Amino acid sequence: MCTAVLGLPSCAQKKTTVPAKAETKTATAVKSETYTVKTLPAGVTADSLQAIEKEYKGSVALIDVWATWCPPCRRAMTMVDSIKPDLMKKGVKFVYITGETSPLETWNEMIPKIHGDHYRLTKEQWKTLMNEQGIPGIPVYKVINKDGSTAFSNLTEGGYPGNDVIKPILEAAVKKK
C-alpha cells in the first residue's frame, strides 16, 4: 500500500514486534570506486540506526531507508542524483539502508549506480529498525549533523520531501561548526 506524503508517496511496511537487545558493534565494509557495502554484525538488532549513525560522526550524512521493490524510493533517488555531486564535494555522505525484502541479486545490480554507502540489514534488524523508529513506510530520510545530532527526520511520516527541502538542510549542516 502506498500513501502520498510530502509530494512523493511511500510504501507502507507491516508492523511487527521484535524483542530488542542492545549491543554495540562496528560495521564492516567492502569498498568500490563509487559505493561501499557495509554490514552490521548479525547480533546487532536494537539501536541499529544508532550503530549506523556512529559510523558517520564527524560528517554530515543523508540516511535513506528504502527497498529495491519500492517505486517511490527509486524515484526519490533519481531526484537526489541531481544534487548529490555538489553535496558530495562538500563532504556529505549518502547512506542507504535496506533489508532482506530487497532481493540480494536485484540489490547487487542496483547499488553500483547509487553512489554512497549501502547497508542491507537482516530480516530481524529491518523489523527492529521499523518498530524502534516508528517507520510507517518507505522511503524515509534522516540528516545527521557532524556532531551526530539530527538536522532533519521524517522517519515517522515517510516520503521524499524534495530537493528544495533536503538540499538547504544539508548545506546548513555542512556549514555548522
Spell out what each predicted region is.
Residues 59-61, 65-69, 103, 137:
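Short pre-active-site segment immediately N-terminal to redox-active cysteine/selenocysteine motifs
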Residues 124-169:
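Thiol/disulfide oxidoreductase modules built on the thioredoxin-like
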Residues 1-42, 176-177:
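N-terminal targeting signals for export/organelle localization
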Residues 59-60, 77-98, 168:
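Conserved helix-turn-beta segment immediately C-terminal to the redox Cys motif
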Residues 36, 85-126, 135:
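Conserved segment of the thioredoxin-like fold in thiol-based oxidoreductases
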Residues 40-61:
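A short beta-strand-turn-helix
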Residues 53-55, 109-113, 117, 151-155, ...:
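Alpha-helical subdomain
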Residues 65-82:
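Conserved redox-active cysteine motifs that mediate thiol-disulfide chemistry
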